[in-house]
Amino acid sequence: MKLNIFASAILLCTSAFPVAASRLDKPYTEVYRPQYHFSPKENWMNDPNGLVYDTDEGIYHIYFQYNPGGTTWGAMSWGHATSRDLMHWTEHPVALRARGFPDNITEMFFSGTVVVDESNTSGFGRKGKVPWVAIYTSYYPMEQVLPSGKRVRKDQQAQSIAYSLDKGMTWTTYDAANPVIAEPPAPYHDQHLEFRDPSVFWHVETSRWVAVVSLAKLHKILIYTSQDLKQWDWVSEFGPANAVGGVWECPSIFPLTLDGSQQDKWVLMLGLNPGGPPGTIGSGTQYIVGDFNGTTFTADADSIYDGSGPNDGMIFEDFEGDESLAARGWATTGDFINASPVRGTLSGQNAVTGFQGQQLFNTFLNGDATTGAITSAPFDITYKYINFLVGGGNDINETAIRLNVNGKTVHASTGSNDEHLTWQSWDVSSLKGQRAVIEIIDNASDGWGHINVDQICFSNTRATNQIANWLDWGPDFYAALSFNGLDRDQRTILAWMNNWQYGAAIPTDPWRSAMTVPRRLALKTIDGKPSLVQQPAGRWRTSGNHGREFSFRAVDGVRPLGRLGKALDIELTFSSNMSPSNGLGEFGVSIAATKGYQYGTRVGYDFATQQVFVDRSRSGDVSFDATFPGVYHAPLSNSANGTISLRILLDWSSVEVFGAHGEATITSQIFPGPDAVYGQLFSSGGQTRDVSLQVREIQSTWH
């Protein structure tokens, strides 16, 4: 749960796109209203909270961060909804309303968990009724003495509990003793403003309740145990590890079997804000695989990253030292004649991060107006991979690093319109023995008209651009939480489908924010290490049993598909054996596109980098925040059978992509125009073969 005050100014849409829905519209038919994702009837929503499955009644309960008084963050309370199938939802009255709402708020209810206390360890049960217990963060906006007699400071965050004797429909706060964890333990007393988001479960082997709570700014998770949910003992901590670009929030920990065997591993999920996946701006969710003994979480070595890149092979260029580019053996043109590597961020540039050592090649010398190129001395290709760090502009024709063989470009890469440098790799195994040069070009002079490059190295190991295991590589997946009460092999999560960067500005009304589709998790060995995979858990009603099917022996260029619809379940498979010209090749489908295809969302696969991508740069209304348009990538290796498969879930204002078995996912909001119901296939850089496409139109779950 993030304490965040958004800027109140929201840019209006241009006339090309619909303005926010009118409150006079029929509920759940408003412009951009999700048709099969949960969203509240009205007002602001963020983190999912207290997800629990009632095994007796067969009902899923979701609680969520909710503002009962408006469409921006504030007056944090717990909303509530239920479903029997994870698809059709009934919204209920607010479960935990901010104390003193609306005019004299003394306590807000931040994120937390609900557990079913079957053995009545808490003692809250009465007359045979099993208590449900909510464990949440209390946020106190003012110094005060509580009904329990405990004194809290202004803006303090502490952990409290409430209980329900009617299966989660109404709640009683434990005012006699709240908060039950008033402050962080002694070493961290000064962190009482950043101590939040308890996730609680019953640990069978030790017969104890376990809670994980975030020390947000320190990138630490505190682990507590309890026998009764009232008295808690701090037993260990974990962190920092992997991604630490922003605060850690919304932690949770749970077991999964590895590869469907009897071997258990434990997964720690963590929200990060900002500092999400490469190419995104704002929040994201990472995970770490390891072991848990009831008190201590120990990460697997292969689940932790140091970001240093491969340690074999040779460094071709690290841009360190005092020599000019020409003195280092680079041929220079344009503004790069007499230029030298630079020490990080230049005047007028956003912070440049992710490079190694003290220096890098940064073409922002005189701002984006700088143009030119540098070309390395020729070299023989003797290793399997060429690895490098790259950031900056995302224009393959204007701002790129290229590999040229015999005067032809065989590989090229760019940044992601982001100043953070990430690892990219070219597989040059088929080019061994040939002579090549590396060229870095900057022919662009407008926004993002620059490129950052560092640490070019030759290796037999592909570099990873990962600093973390990302649960989702898109910009709109945060605060993921799993349901308590389900069997281990049914581990199911929801996440907030929005981003703190622009969440209060998205053009929706009278509600703001939706949840992702529910996703079933599994743990599988991929590329030699345990990795989370996820698949949609719902079965939505579609138009017809098979929908529309397309089959093409080969696609080259574009192939219009006609009118497809606004809410779709798409399955796309194609051969991974494309031989792209000039080292460049993409295949995919444009969806939610206008009739003339001036606007649309591109979902596809980059054969050169082996990445699935979502491009929402021209998806519709992107005017409300400068960081909203973008292209997002997730690594997806070729399959053993030589095919790539993508499942794409399109709703009225979102797209979720699941690559292969679900090891690569991208979640992205979009806000297309009213006529954006068309689609077309695209193949650039060569032919894509053996294309199969199935499109089913999903019916609304609200009507």
From Swiss-Prot:
Residues 1-21 form the signal peptide. GO terms for molecular function: sucrose alpha-glucosidase activity. This is Putative glycosyl hydrolase ecdE. The active site is at residue 47. Belongs to the glycosyl hydrolase 32 family. It comes from the Eukaryota. One of its GO terms (cellular component) is cytoplasm. Its EC number is 3.2.1.-. InterPro entries: ConA-like_dom_sf, Glyco_hydro_32, Glyco_hydro_32_AS, Glyco_hydro_32_C, Glyco_hydro_32_N, Glyco_hydro_beta-prop_sf. One of its GO terms (biological process) is sucrose catabolic process. The lineage of its organism: Eukaryota, Fungi, Dikarya, Ascomycota, Pezizomycotina.
